[in-house]
Amino acid sequence: MKILKRLLKIVFALIGVLVLIGLITLWVDSFGTKSLKIDKNDPTSNNSYLITNVNVIPMNQDTVLADKMVYLKEGIIEKIADTIEISGIQIFDAENKYLTPGLIDMHVHVWDRYELGLYLSNGVTAVRNLWGMPMHLRIKEDVIEGNIISPTFFTTGPKLTGTEFIGDDNLNLSSPEEAKEKVISFKERGYDLIKTYYGLDKEIFDAVVVQAKISEMDIVSHPSQKVPFSYHLNPQIKSIEHAEEIVQQPLHFDLDTIKLQSIIDSISQSKHTSYCPTITVFNNIYQMMMNDSILDSESLKYMNPLIKKTDSKKQFERWFNAKREDPETVGRIKKQHDFHMTIVKKLHEAGVTIICGTDAGIGVTLPGFSIHTELAFYKNAGLSNYEVLKTATVNASKTHTLMNQLGTIEEGKTANLLIVDRNPLTTLSALKAPSTVFVKGRKLDRETLEHLNEKAKNRKNLMASALRYLEHLIVER
């Protein structure tokens, strides 16, 4: 008995030590993102400005409002006019640059708070996180309460999948009753949206849709192969993810434009449905196959170290081996990417609402930087600059009611804004590295944004990231 008590004491002592080490690790990691915290005495806490000498690209119409003034009051666009007279306000001279709505990335996977800075430095002032974990609820709370400077943050709950789709990243549902319980739980805990994933059969899928409607939660859907593709055109499902899913499911990898057209037509008739192509993440498969040293590239230094050590490495090895076993795989991947571009073109021509999403945070798809690659792909698919910019602004904001305050420069809207040196309606690349970012009216200059980049580069938070993921597994599984 004494030996048992002694063993129990040792076990509890070890557990206590491990918990203490974990808490210290997370505490130390929090210092790395201290620059995101809002100090009420710091200039970045100010969220009221009068912007002068600025050319406004409102994005509610294809135009430029030349030489305007824009009054931001407590994080809201209060007034846009030729002349505004306000006393006691800080004036920001835009020097005849261009003011656009902040960009919205509608498909991301956030792994730490350093990534929030990477999004801001690239002009992304709102994100839709599509793999919810407890840490995302804490980020969301801090954003809402104004504790940190961050993109406006929306998140789904954990990915809902069927029983046979095994993996620690999936929440496997075994019955309609369990599906309803999870939706109710996600709503109560503060998740914004529901994400359905691969492997949901009809009964469970129906249960999720029914309960989501009752709970007033929009659904974002990575199509399930257990139901017809057209099944995802349900009014409760506000966006469908990935152009590649059209290839994999209804087309069964047959890259046939005639067969594609009927699928495009069915999507276009579903006026409540937005489509998020995520061209970049699939193209990055091709990039991995073409560059054997991609994991050592300068850009990957911005990737979360846990993801770089696990998912990035795993994906690279998968496609490296596929190329080695069958060299023609490279050509097939490139051909499918080109077909994805055709899908984007056809979706646009059919009047489908396209929303910009990158799938950043997995593989080698970088947070923040990747949105400019995604937008360039849409341009190459045949969209005009205005139509491209719509995908990351007004189209995104109309997809979910909870995002309606974003996406355009209008009086009463949230002051998530970019100041860029050139007109993006003529030069799309002008959106890269904006000179100034306003997020809920708070101003970040280029020097501050570059500092956020540097803090994220080569960060040493692998253990802290692993602990947060462990928390997710304990809480959600």
List the model feature ranges, each with a label:
Residues 101-109:
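Metallo-beta-lactamase
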Residues 38-42, 56-69, 366, 384-389, ...:
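Acidic, glycine-enriched loop/beta-strand segments at the rims
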Residues 1-19:
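N-terminal Sec-pathway targeting helices
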Residues 191-193, 252-377, 473-477:
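Active-site neighborhoods of metal-dependent hydrolases
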Residues 29-48, 56, 60-100:
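Histidine-rich, glycine-flanked metal-binding segment
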